[in-house]
Amino acid sequence: MDERELQALVERISLDVFHKPFRHRAVFNDRLRTTGGRYVLSTHHIELNRKYYEQYGEEELIQVIKHELCHYHLYLEGKGYRHRDRDFRELLQKVQAPRFCKPVLLSKTKKEHYYKCTSCRYMYVRRKALDTTRYVCGFCRGKLKKIKREC
């Protein structure tokens, strides 16, 4: 699904479900990691997570769009648009939109760097690489050497 199709889908859902037009932009935001989407108050745009669409499909994306459109329409009407507001919860029930979305499964590879002290043989395991010319062993002040993991 590209940006044009997404915009058309959001406009159609807004008219079919809420009977009100959506007059702003709906875009995919690849920086979203843990949420399905968000409504931006300052611009009134709706940003959606592309990974959420790829993981769960169009049906779940429609649910997220309905949720974000609840924020959108309530804010423009001057009603309570936050999750804790009664107006928001009532509109969610009326349009059968979820209050929270399914969690996005992150496929983050865990890379580790291994260093060994040349003097005391202490093994360091780190997530971030370090410059072995600037750092020394914390126990004996010996030099560190980057090694490959021993299985």
Swiss-Prot record:
GO biological process, one term: response to stress
A Pfam entry, by short name: SprT-like
Subcellular location: Cytoplasm
Metal-binding is among the record's keywords: yes
InterPro entries: SprT-like_domain, Uncharacterised_SprT-like
Cellular component terms per the entry's GO annotation: cytoplasm
Cofactor, free-text remark: Binds 1 zinc ion.
Segments forming domain SprT-like: 6-148
Tree of life domain: Bacteria
Residues at the active site: 68
Coiled coil (UniProt feature): none
GO molecular function: zinc ion binding
Binding site for Zn(2+): 67, 71
Cofactor(s) the record lists: Zn(2+)
Record key words, sorted: Cytoplasm, Metal-binding, Zinc
NCBIfam families: PRK04351.1
Similarity field: Belongs to the SprT family.
UniProt name for this protein: Protein SprT-like
Organism for this UniProt entry: Anoxybacillus flavithermus (strain DSM 21510 / WK1)
